[in-house]
């Protein structure tokens, strides 16, 4: 009998050692996050797409073996389900940027929630999942916005490097201003980078200059989830 019990306890102990631990999300919900926590990582993020320029950006990221995060909008996502699939298939993270790009603090609870759930209804058929990470339009939040994001289980991502690429859409300004902003804020310790894949000069010029600088500094260009220590399973609902 004692020999049998010993075998049972041995089997239970062995099973405990080999059974995977349940998923524990490391990143809190409903709190504004501006910085990566994994050493030597940088998160390039692109808002407002997908757009006609997104395939070119995906090609560029592939050439540099870099991963990025795309915070997408409702209509753009609805018109480009194949690009959403390509993003995920190539190791990038698809995040939520609301359906209509409206300032969330201007809305009540139900309006804020609707902006997120309507976008989920577009993304889920394309990917089979919906994002668990979001970026508020204009980086604007208030306590009600953050409460809704907690209730909907969203991680709220801001930025510590703002390229302001939307203000600098010509060949000179994108380098002299946006890329210089990138360098200055990188030097100051920023590592979550805000840009937009809906703008030609961002994709045609700025993105590659940023990737070259990332490589020169020995940094790893990865997704927001990864730079915060979250595995891919935690990027989605």
UniProtKB/Swiss-Prot annotation:
Q: What is its main location?
A: secreted
Activity's sensitivity to pH is recorded as: Optimum pH is 8.
Q: Which cofactor does it need?
A: Co(2+)
Quote the record's binding site residues for Co(2+): 48, 97, 101
InterPro entries found in the cross-reference section: Glyco_hydro/deAcase_b/a-brl, NODB_dom
Question: Which reaction(s) does the protein catalyse, per the Swiss-Prot or TrEMBL entry?
Answer: [(1->4)-N-acetyl-beta-D-glucosaminyl](n) + n H2O = chitosan + n acetate
Q: Where is this site: May prevent de-N-acetylated sugar residues from interacting with the active site?
A: 164
Cofactor: binding details: Evidence supports a metal cofactor but evidence for cobalt is inconsistent.
Q: Which UniProt keywords apply?
A: Carbohydrate metabolism, Cell wall biogenesis/degradation, Chitin degradation, Chitin-binding, Cobalt, Glycoprotein, Hydrolase, Metal-binding, Polysaccharide degradation, Secreted, Signal
Q: Where, by residue number, is the active site?
A: 47 (proton acceptor), 196 (proton donor)
Q: Name one GO cellular component term.
A: extracellular region
Supply the enzyme class, top level.
hydrolase
Record bears the keyword Glycoprotein: yes
Asked if the keyword Membrane belongs to this entry, the reply reads no
Temperature-related activity data read:
Optimum temperature is 50 degrees Celsius.
Give start and end of each NodB homology domain.
40-222
Known Pfam families for this protein? Polysacc_deac_1 (PF01522)
In the record, which residues are listed under signal peptide? 1-18
UniProt xrefs under CDD domains: CE4_ClCDA_like
Q: What exactly does this protein do?
A: Hydrolyzes the N-acetamido groups of N-acetyl-D-glucosamine polymers in chitin to form chitosan and acetate.
Family of the protein in this entry: Belongs to the polysaccharide deacetylase family.
Q: Which PANTHER family match?
A: CHITIN DEACETYLASE, CHITIN DEACETYLASE-RELATED
This chain belongs to the protein called Chitin deacetylase
Question: Whose protein is this, by species?
Answer: Emericella nidulans (strain FGSC A4 / ATCC 38163 / CBS 112.46 / NRRL 194 / M139) (Aspergillus nidulans)
């Amino acid at each position: 009998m004692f020999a049998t019990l010993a075998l049972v306890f041995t089997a239970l102990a062995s099973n405990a050692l080999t059974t995977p631990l349940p998923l524990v999300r490391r990143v809190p919900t409903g709190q504004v996050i501006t910085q990566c926590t994994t050493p030597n990582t940088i998160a390039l993020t692109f808002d407002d797409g997908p757009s006609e320029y997104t395939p070119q950006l995906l090609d560029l990221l592939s050439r540099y073996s870099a991963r990025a995060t795309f915070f997408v909008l409702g209509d753009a996502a609805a018109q480009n389900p194949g690009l959403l699939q390509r993003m995920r298939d190539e190791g990038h993270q698809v995040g939520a940027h609301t359906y209509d790009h409206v300032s969330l603090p201007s809305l009540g609870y139900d309006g804020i929630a609707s902006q997120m759930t309507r976008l989920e209804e577009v993304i889920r058929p394309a990917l089979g999942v919906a994002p668990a990470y979001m970026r508020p339009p204009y980086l604007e939040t208030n306590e009600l916005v953050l409460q809704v994001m907690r209730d909907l289980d969203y991680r709220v991502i801001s930025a510590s490097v703002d390229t302001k690429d939307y203000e600098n859409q010509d060949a000179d300004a994108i380098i002299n201003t946006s890329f210089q902003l990138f360098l200055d804020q990188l030097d100051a310790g920023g590592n979550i980078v805000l840009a937009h894949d809906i703008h030609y000069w961002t994709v045609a010029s700025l993105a590659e200059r940023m990737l070259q600088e990332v490589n020169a500094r020995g940094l790893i260009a990865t997704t927001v989830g990864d730079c915060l220590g979250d595995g891919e399973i935690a990027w989605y609902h």
